[in-house]
A protein has these predicted regions:
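Periplasmic-side early beta-strands and strand-to-turn transitions of outer-membrane beta-barrels
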Residues: 1-48
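Face-selective signature of the C-terminal outer-membrane beta-barrel domain
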Residues: 4-20, 50-207, 211, 217, ...
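Outer-membrane beta-barrel translocator domains and adjoining extracellular loop/strand segments
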Residues: 24-42, 86-95, 100, 146-154, ...
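Membrane-embedded beta-strands of outer-membrane beta-barrel proteins
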Residues: 59-61, 119-121, 178-180, 220-222, ...
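Outer-membrane beta-barrel signature, preferentially recognizing the C-terminal barrel domain
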Residues: 167-171, 213, 242-292, 297-299, ...
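C-terminal beta-signal and adjacent terminal beta-strands/loops
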Residues: 242, 345, 396, 421-479
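Gram-negative outer-membrane beta-barrel transporters
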Residues: 294-299, 317-398
Length: 479
């Protein structure tokens, strides 16, 4: 809803609701001995069956009042509610793969509910020199209520609780932020923006653990934009960023990929980073597309990774980490080759570094890819109701770091696409498909008897994980 209430007042409202019931995500894991590089003898086979119920709603809006040509006021609000109920059952087979002699080895349930409320008020002032000043305040409240349970079963069906502590709780955050920014021209071709934000927040946890902490951060930012040609622009920025804490990390859970309990860490704090970003944007003639080259560097204080907590691996903060990245992405119209066609592409190379808290050796960041590529081809067939899309994405391998484990994970390339039929001006029928390639990924895992710094190897395994492909039919309407 977008309504001009008075000549000086505009009101915008929106509402969204969703539900996604019993979304099955079957997955198979095959394990081999460390010396079985050809993957001929299966030691273990685990089949995961999952259900995932989701529902929620969001209500948002803003009111804008114009005092005169130079001054205006805007108030925004967002209210969100999300519910998620996940259940997983693992069926295991030990050395009898051909006979399919499976037994249920574990049952896991994860019930969570999220609430969010954001209120933001800002004033804007325009100046004769082309500058603009914005200042205001923002208030946010976030809440997570979560309950996790893990039950182990042996081949005889005898169950045993995992006995894990801190599996139920409520995490709440109250956050307040004041901000001011000034955007102004330096020359006819160069604009700059300087900004300063101050953030204060309190995070409290109740349930199995009772804890409350406060955080305060200054977040400066400076931007430059240079239109050195009509269709080319250079952008440069320096800023301090504060990471967003994942509230799930405060409460214990189970990592299905690593088959390890992940303890909750009530002492977790947000990471902070100084970031430098340099971009060059080239807009092709005749609205032919855009190509962007980006260089990025960041120094992170307290990156969030796995640390030892109470005999388990938990999510916690490390020392100082670094990230550097070069990225190329763009979108080009290819009507001369494919009428109505658009080709999108993306690729990046990056390097990361942090000091491992257990081995005291520098390494890359946990689960960070060194490179990624993407190709996306779409065609709106001229003079017809049809459009189609095919996309391809590939990744480098990633390393898995844990106080008690080291692993390597490499995903197979992913292929997907869609076909859309325009029924009328308001309705579309979409056919979507994904994961057409057979395997999902391959990996290697080394589990240590104690900290990995002792080099006392307990288990070495090779494995691959297979996710099933899917086909989805969707009716989409606009009213």
């Amino acid at each position: 809803l977008n309504s001009k209430i008075t000549p000086k007042d505009t009101l915008r409202l929106n509402m969204l609701t969703w539900f996604d019931s019993k979304e099955a995500e079957p997955q198979s894991q095959y394990y081999y001995g460390s010396g079985d590089s050809s993957k001929e003898d299966i030691l273990r086979y685990i089949n995961w069956n999952r259900t995932d119920d989701q529902d929620g709603w969001e209500i948002g809006g803003d009111w804008e009042h114009t005092f005169n040509s130079k001054h205006s006021f805007k108030f925004r609000s967002v209210l969100t509610k999300k519910n998620n109920d996940k259940k997983s059952i693992s069926k295991e087979n030990n050395g009898d793969y051909l006979n399919k002699n499976f037994y249920i080895s574990s049952k896991e349930s994860n019930d969570r509910s999220e609430n969010e409320r954001i209120l933001r008020a800002s004033f804007n002032t325009n100046f004769k020199n082309g500058g603009a000043l914005e200042y205001g305040v923002e208030s946010a409240y976030n809440k997570l209520e979560r309950s996790f349970a893990l039950l182990y079963l042996n081949p005889d069906g005898i169950s045993q609780d995992s006995g894990l502590f801190n599996t139920k709780g409520k995490v709440e955050e109250d956050r307040y932020e004041g901000f001011v920014s000034y955007n102004f021209p330096l020359t006819n071709l160069i604009r700059s923006e300087i900004a300063m934000n101050y953030e204060w927040s309190e995070i409290s946890q109740s349930g199995d653990v009772e804890l409350s902490r406060e955080f305060q951060y200054w977040k400066p930012r400076i931007d430059f934009k240079w239109d050195y040609r009509k269709n080319r622009q250079v952008r440069f920025s320096i800023l301090r960023n504060v990471g967003q804490i994942n509230f799930d990390d405060f409460i214990s859970s189970f990592d299905q990929f690593e088959e390890r309990i992940r303890a909750g860490n009530p002492d977790l704090k947000p990471s902070t980073a100084w970031e430098i970003n340099l971009e060059h944007e080239w807009r092709l003639a005749n609205d032919g597309g855009v190509i962007t080259l980006t260089g990025f560097a960041s120094q992170i204080d307290g990156p969030v990774e796995r640390v030892p907590v109470g005999g388990y691996a938990a999510v916690g903060n490390l020392g100082t980490g670094e990230i550097t990245q070069a990225k190329l992405d763009g979108s080009i119209r290819i009507g001369n080759v494919l009428p109505g066609g658009v080709l999108r592409f993306m690729g990046y190379l990056q390097s990361t570094e942090v000091l491992d808290p257990v081995t005291n050796i520098k390494r890359d960041l946990h689960f960070f890819r060194r490179w990624e590529t993407m190709l996306d081809l779409r065609q709106d067939i001229p003079n017809s109701r049809y459009s189609w899309r095919v996309w391809y994405r590939s990744y480098s391998q990633t390393n898995i770091y844990d106080p008690y484990l080291w692993g390597r994970w490499a995903e197979e390339p992913m292929l997907g696409g869609s076909l859309s039929v325009k029924i009328n001006s308001k309705l579309n029928l979409n056919f979507m498909f994904n994961r057409l390639l057979e395997k999902y990924g391959v990996g290697r895992k080394i589990v240590y008897n104690g900290f990995k710094s002792s080099n006392d190897i307990l288990i070495q395994e090779n494995f691959y994980v297979r996710n099933h492909g899917f086909i989805k039919i969707q009716l989409e309407g606009t009213f």
